[in-house]
């Protein structure tokens, strides 16, 4: 059994579904919210689509890793619940993260997704009047920030897919021996 092919085929099928999901979410969001165009790399609508797609794919890759590590469905659901709470707590949206919390946030999908969405929509300048704490490098409306966020989302996805394959391969090899 070629476990890499199994993991990659699952990831590919998920990606195909997520392209449709990202398109639906983006079109719905853009039509309801009327997002101002910032045009860092592409039209803001396209940047939002790419960000949502990368967030969905990185989240699915994390799910693949969880399902590879935990054989029991009940355990996997509990782990996913903890991961979902972590997405909110370590996203950098609720409060400023420092120290260990900042380090944990560096592997959180939501943190990089929110950073990319904030960069695409120039969240810093658009919400400055609120003084809501959104001003910061996380939401800098720069090409470098946007690309950095996208790269981190892609890296998280790649690491999770490779880790899922390695976990399955090690488990398979142990059962064979």
Model-predicted segments: where are they?
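Membrane-spanning alpha-helical segments of multipass transporters and channels
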Residues: 1-177
């Amino acid at each position: 059994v070629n476990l890499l092919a199994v993991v990659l085929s699952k990831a590919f099928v998920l990606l195909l579904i997520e392209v449709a999901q990202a398109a639906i979410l983006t079109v719905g969001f853009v039509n309801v919210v009327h997002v101002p165009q910032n045009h860092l790399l592409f039209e803001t609508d396209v940047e939002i689509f790419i960000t949502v797609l990368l967030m969905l794919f990185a989240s699915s890759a994390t799910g693949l890793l969880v399902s590879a590590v935990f054989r029991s469905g009940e355990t996997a659901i509990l782990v996913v619940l903890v991961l979902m709470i972590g997405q909110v707590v370590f996203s950098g949206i609720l409060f400023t993260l420092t120290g260990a919390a900042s380090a944990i946030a560096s592997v959180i999908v939501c943190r990089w997704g929110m950073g990319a969405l904030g960069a695409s929509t120039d969240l810093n300048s658009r919400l400055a009047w609120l003084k809501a704490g959104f001003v910061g490098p996380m939401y800098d409306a720069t090409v470098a920030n946007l690309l950095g966020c996208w790269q981190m989302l892609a890296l998280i996805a790649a690491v999770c897919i490779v880790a899922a394959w390695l976990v399955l391969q090690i488990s398979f090899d142990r059962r064979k021996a």
